[in-house]
Amino acid sequence: MFRVGFLIISSSSSLSPLLLVSVVRVNTTNCHKCLLSGTYIFAVLLVCVVFHSGAQEKNYTIREEIPENVLIGNLLKDLNLSLIPNKSLTTTMQFKLVYKTGDVPLIRIEEDTGEIFTTGARIDREKLCAGIPRDEHCFYEVEVAILPDEIFRLVKIRFLIEDINDNAPLFPATVINISIPENSAINSKYTLPAAVDPDVGINGVQNYELIKSQNIFGLDVIETPEGDKMPQLIVQKELDREEKDTYVMKVKVEDGGFPQRSSTAILQVSVTDTNDNHPVFKETEIEVSIPENAPVGTSVTQLHATDADIGENAKIHFSFSNLVSNIARRLFHLNATTGLITIKEPLDREETPNHKLLVLASDGGLMPARAMVLVNVTDVNDNVPSIDIRYIVNPVNDTVVLSENIPLNTKIALITVTDKDADHNGRVTCFTDHEIPFRLRPVFSNQFLLENAAYLDYESTKEYAIKLLAADAGKPPLNQSAMLFIKVKDENDNAPVFTQSFVTVSIPENNSPGIQLMKVSATDADSGPNAEINYLLGPDAPPEFSLDRRTGMLTVVKKLDREKEDKYLFTILAKDNGVPPLTSNVTVFVSIIDQNDNSPVFTHNEYKFYVPENLPRHGTVGLITVTDPDYGDNSAVTLSILDENDDFTIDSQTGVIRPNISFDREKQESYTFYVKAEDGGRVSRSSSAKVTINVVDVNDNKPVFIVPPYNYSYELVLPSTNPGTVVFQVIAVDNDTGMNAEVRYSIVGGNTRDLFAIDQETGNITLMEKCDVTDLGLHRVLVKANDLGQPDSLFSVVIVNLFVNESVTNATLINELVRKSIEAPVTPNTEIADVSSPTSDYVKILVAAVAGTITVVVVIFITAVVRCRQAPHLKAAQKNMQNSEWATPNPENRQMIMMKKKKKKKKHSPKNLLLNVVTIEETKADDVDSDGNRVTLDLPIDLEEQTMGKYNWVTTPTTFKPDSPDLARHYKSASPQPAFQIQPETPLNLKHHIIQELPLDNTFVACDSISNCSSSSSDPYSVSDCGYPVTTFEVPVSVHTRPSQRRVTFHLPEGSQESSSDGGLGDHDAGSLTSTSHGLPLGYPQEEYFDRATPSNRTEGDGNSDPESTFIPGLKKEITVQPTVEEASDNCTQECLIYGHSDACWMPASLDHSSSSQAQASALCHSPPLSQASTQHHSPPVTQTIVLCHSPPVTQTIALCHSPPPIQVSALHHSPPLVQGTALHHSPPSAQASALCYSPPLAQAAAISHSSSLPQVIALHRSQAQSSVSLQQGWVQGANGLCSVDQGVQGSATSQFYTMSERLHPSDDSIKVIPLTTFAPRQQARPSRGDSPIMETHPL
């Protein structure tokens, strides 16, 4: 029987097709030991096989006794080798069977196709696998190598040999003798010897048959535990020895194969006397182990059997059964009497590892006893490893011949090492000597591939004797060695080598043909024809050279010219006679030595240069370029001008021509001369060229405008002009010629509304759209005239002033507007039109009329309510209070005033000027430095009384008459800020919240920078402001107009402190106060307002009362209106009008500076921005500049101007928590102005020092550093400079501040404002900036 084995088919990733077919070394004598050992090693070590070498396994099944040339398989298809990528192979794919020299392979393989066929050798399974157990499969193994080396692969092919029924079962002997006692009972069984069949499976013994038994005996077949079938003879009838003592018959045995095979034997049965008892073994199964190196005669085991009989029937005889193999009978001896088994011959585990011994014990009877002895032969390291070399490269006389240029990892031989020992005694390693270019790479268990690990070189080593060593792992280890010889075949693998890789040689030009230049030589390390060298010129070699093929001599065959070719670079080849031939090369550099055989050459025969006429002296005219094909000094060219021309010079090295003269095209248009070029050769050569220089015109004149000739002219454009009409034409001329004189026009600035367009060629300015109201006024158009000169165009610009209006009624105004527009910066897309054009005034009038109408309705309603609460006689008393007011003009304007003096005296009565003083007193309790000190500011204001009378009320649109009692009600507030509000920050005693009412016909007017005056309401208490440009200061103030000799004080004491001013009404008590509902003065919110009646049923504040005080909730300032000093005008002289008033004019003798607690100096301090005075400083919002402007007695309009910080519009600021104020700005139409408080940007403010004889005056100080004045409270200007208000003003000199408004001509409706200046008595005033003050004229 055979045991089932296993098969592993492995596919390597490299798919290197080489199949070594290793023929299994099987022989008939020791095949059993060999296969058992190989199977064990394969099973244990196969999983450790390294497959990276391209090893695979493939199984095929064949039947034994197969005839010759039967196709078994096709490796190319079965291994899918057709899927291998198409690589560039040195040779075609080959299949090579690898086997040991002397072996006869059972199969063959076609090298080209991979087809496997049987050979003529007989395939006998019973011979190949005689020693293996019957239950295992029988395999035959070979190795096939797939070549070439690029796709090398080693494939192990295992052929499973199937059994056929080629053997008949046979009995151990042809005659079988058996004895049966005569008293044997019926159905008694007696064992017969079994037949043996070499085939396995169904082809083995299957049936026994008894022939001619005469029905006395029968036959039965039983199966042993080992699977063997044993025949048994059955007694069917009683036997009688006296009747018949011998029976003869036949026994037939058959197998199950096809065709069925059988055999027979003669069975002879002898009937004997009775033997009642049978022998019995103590142990029926015994297993023992014995080493294979046990000596002969060694006891294996001792068998014991007993028999109950006595005498002869009790004697036992031991023997081997006929089922014991011949090998076992040969190796073991059984003592028939004692039953001792001993070793008859030396054991070999590698041949048979175990033995089954069936022992019979018989007492002479027919029923012997049976016992099975299993002998296991244990291994000892008694076998040295064996080395089996199977060549992949066919050897020649046991020597492998390898070419020296074989690639790396070329497979040379398959080395198989084996060891018949088991376990570690059979583990074998194989290795080679060191320092050889070969290595062993494992592929299968105990199989290695010998391959080259480095390139072979015949020139260094021609032969190799490789010693292979194999050693097992036993103790002590056993080893074996084998030799493998390799001879290296020379190949043409060495190219010829030149002694130098780069050769340089020089030769003069103009040489003689045939001159030998040099000789080249090379060597070759190969031998024979591979070392024979021929010399050749490379493909890049010029035809001027030739080379001797054998000697390598280089020759120049042509005349060389350095100017054509100054060097040659080519290769020379050395080629051997090998197959294929190898070549190498050397680079040859031939340098040609120059000779001076060429003259300098100009790039042009004649040079023409064009230079501009404005080229400066010694400028660059042009560059002369000259070449010389020679080299070195022979090509060093020097340039010079012939005929000693002094007008021009030339650089001898660079060739740059420069003029020594200034060009003038009108005098001479061209210059001609010759330039000489000479080289530096030993025998020099030279040449010359003509140079012509032409002088050309340049664009050096820009267009000049002749119309308009300057920027200050203007052109009138009627609003009715139709679009497309040419309104003006600009004309510019250019003194250049040609394209340099062609002029083109364009508008580059102004004209933001695209109202005008210009023709770029004619310069005609055309009106593009119909003019509407918004287009009226002055338009400033920036026109550019540029020529078409190259490379840079020149241009000029002019401002064209177009005045869109029906007519020019005031040329002076237009000229002034033009002048102002010229001073303004001009940028593209900037509107040039004047913002103060009459059109904008018309829009303002329209808007003001609508807003004023709404305001008047509200004001009338509030006024009616207020007047109903006042006594009727107050109106008459207020109208009678008129005072003459005198004024001293600004010294800087005295000449202008004196020029107009006579004219005004003829046409006008003397001016009635009203002088009022408004005093603001404030106690800052929260300032630790003030300590209750009070600051009082007194401001005298004068206004021409006849100004209103001269206003043209007929021609100017208005809604009121000059004698209107309330001029301010018709004005409209243009301030972008909310109404003026004052909120108290701290709670105050209600008994001090008293407001002194003034007469109902008082009006407060605000004056802006363009003489536009406005009033916030027609209430008795209205707020006026005066707005100025950013560069000027603004002085907003609240004013209560009053009759002459009247004083009104607004006072808000701290806590329970009473006012120091005499109200004239006795003490104030809360019980006598009545609340009112009308609007508060100065735009104060109506929070708590108290009205108190006098015993004469008159409201407080009438014209007959003494100076009184009015308390405003939340206001911590005391505003006092002082009586005017009319008697001061009696002391004035003509000198006062020119040089200013003296102390005699201002101060009566009765007035004492220290007589009153309120006679503290009050000053309006304009602190210079750079002032660093370290005195008490009050924040600007606290310091208030107040100017009170009185109108003529008709309307008694008072303008109040306040100057906050420069960037703010007019506002009244109180430092929190005293009073919080918001700004109120009025810009009424200019036509409605009845009073003017104007401060131009450069107006010169004068500082007034307090006089000791005048209780309260106003001191103003203007900053000399900036025209924009910032206000700082706490400083006044005295005779000795700046001094603190807390200290008072002690100087005696008096500076004065006045503002005068007057008319220059009766028909002129505009109002002139003469700025004031600072001057001392009897001193000429110094103008601030310029010789005369700047005068601003309102358009109306």
Curated annotation (Swiss-Prot):
Subcellular location field: Cell membrane
A molecular function GO annotation: calcium ion binding
Membrane topology reported for the UniProt record: Single-pass type I membrane protein
Stretches assigned to the Extracellular side: 29-844
Transmembrane parts of this sequence: 845-865
Glycan attachment residues as annotated in the record: 59, 80, 86, 376, 585, 805
Record key words, sorted: Calcium, Cell adhesion, Cell membrane, Chromosomal rearrangement, Glycoprotein, Membrane, Repeat, Signal, Transmembrane, Transmembrane helix
GO cellular component entries: plasma membrane; sperm head; sperm midpiece
Region (Disordered) residue spans: 1052-1112, 1321-1340
Pfam families, alphabetized: Cadherin, Cadherin_2, Protocadherin
Secretion signal span: 1-28
Gene Ontology terms: biological process: cell adhesion; homophilic cell adhesion via plasma membrane adhesion molecules; positive regulation of Wnt signaling pathway; spermatogenesis
Residue ranges occupied by any Cadherin domain in the UniProt entry: 58-171, 172-281, 282-387, 394-498, 499-602, 603-705, 709-827
Disease in which the protein is involved: A chromosomal aberration involving PCDH11Y is a cause of multiple congenital abnormalities, including severe bilateral vesicoureteral reflux (VUR) with ureterovesical junction defects. Translocation t(Y;3)(p11;p12) with ROBO2.
Subunit structure: Interacts with CTNNB1.
Function: Potential calcium-dependent cell-adhesion protein.
Name listed for the protein in its UniProt record: Protocadherin-11 Y-linked
Gene that encodes it: PCDH11Y
